[in-house]
From Swiss-Prot:
It comes from Thermoanaerobacter pseudethanolicus (strain ATCC 33223 / 39E) (Clostridium thermohydrosulfuricum). GO terms for cellular component: cytosolic large ribosomal subunit. The keyword Ribonucleoprotein applies. GO terms for molecular function: structural constituent of ribosome. Belongs to the universal ribosomal protein uL29 family. PANTHER family: 60S RIBOSOMAL PROTEIN L35/50S RIBOSOMAL PROTEIN L29, LARGE RIBOSOMAL SUBUNIT PROTEIN UL29C. The keyword Ribosomal protein applies. HAMAP family: Ribosomal_uL29. This is Large ribosomal subunit protein uL29.
Length: 69
């Protein structure tokens, strides 16, 4: 998910998405430990998306807005 797409979501949607991604990350790590993970790059993608969501939530909390045209 791109940062631009994330910024279009409301805070409630972001919190729900964050919860879903954390659950997915847990499942991916479990699959990795048991040797059943097909795509290990998915872990990286999920972690980065979680970081993007947390960053955008924090920006909104602080009132920071980044306009890039």
């Amino acid at each position: 998910m791109k940062a631009r797409e994330i910024r279009e979501l409301t805070n409630e949607e972001l919190l729900q998405k964050l919860s879903d991604l954390k659950a997915e990350l847990f499942n991916l790590r479990f699959q990795l430990a048991t040797g059943q993970l097909d795509n290990p790059m998915r872990i990286r993608d999920v972690r980065k998306t979680i970081a993007r969501i947390k960053t955008i939530l924090r920006e909104r909390e602080l009132g920071i807005r980044q306009n890039k045209a």
